[in-house]
Amino acid sequence: GFEINTVKVTDYNAAVEAMRAGRADIAWYGGKTYIKAAEIADAEAFAAGVRPGEKNANYFAYFVVKADSQIKSFSEVKGKTLSLNTIGSTSGDLIPQVELSKINLSTTNKKHFKNVFYAGSHDACLLSVLNDQADVCGMSSRNFEARLADNTFRMEQVRIIHRSDPVPPPPLAYSKKISLKDRQKIKKAVLEAHNYGTIGGY
């Protein structure tokens, strides 16, 4: 067996740096961050989570407004205050940026939005809308569903004005600096873990 030590990091880029510097051997990355980790930190994806009862792990980026918002369609976000997750987040930054570009909007163009800010997490992004700090937020459907399930908010409080195309799930990756033998053991343990208990988390 292996002795496991957990390292908490502040953001996605810190997770990449931890593996690059040898402070972390395994990390759960967002899709965008994994590409960077594979390029500079010798990361190799080997698993992705699938929730019980689901056939695939794809999810979406949602654009969410309050139920009583004057914003009725996605194109009406122009000129409003937008909140996102964190820089480097797949469903809370990259995919929202891509979706906005499809309607010729950019978060870096000051003429397109009244204000754009990063809330720091998907949950904080949602709360920024509920607390009237932002008109619209771009966030992960996974977190939206989780907060709905734990009664952080009620569905009648909000509206989803846009949903992205399906997004591949965030991969669990290990460093190629780990021996092949140990990587195979880790992969086997992770892929069989659901046979021995319930796995929670992201």
Predicted regions, residues:
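Bilobed "Venus flytrap"/periplasmic-binding protein-like clamshell domains
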Residues: 1, 32, 53-126, 142, ...
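N-terminal hydrophobic or amphipathic helices and topogenic motifs
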Residues: 1-14, 200-202
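General small-molecule cofactor/ligand-binding pocket signal
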Residues: 5-7, 116-117, 159-161
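Short helices/loops that flank or line small-molecule/ion binding pockets
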Residues: 8, 13-27, 40-41, 59, ...
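Short beta-strand-centered segments that line the small-molecule binding cleft or hinge
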Residues: 25-27, 35-60
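A ligand-binding cleft/hinge motif common to bilobed small-molecule-binding domains
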Residues: 28-42, 96-102, 127-156
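Periplasmic-binding protein-like
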Residues: 47, 52-62, 150-196, 200-202
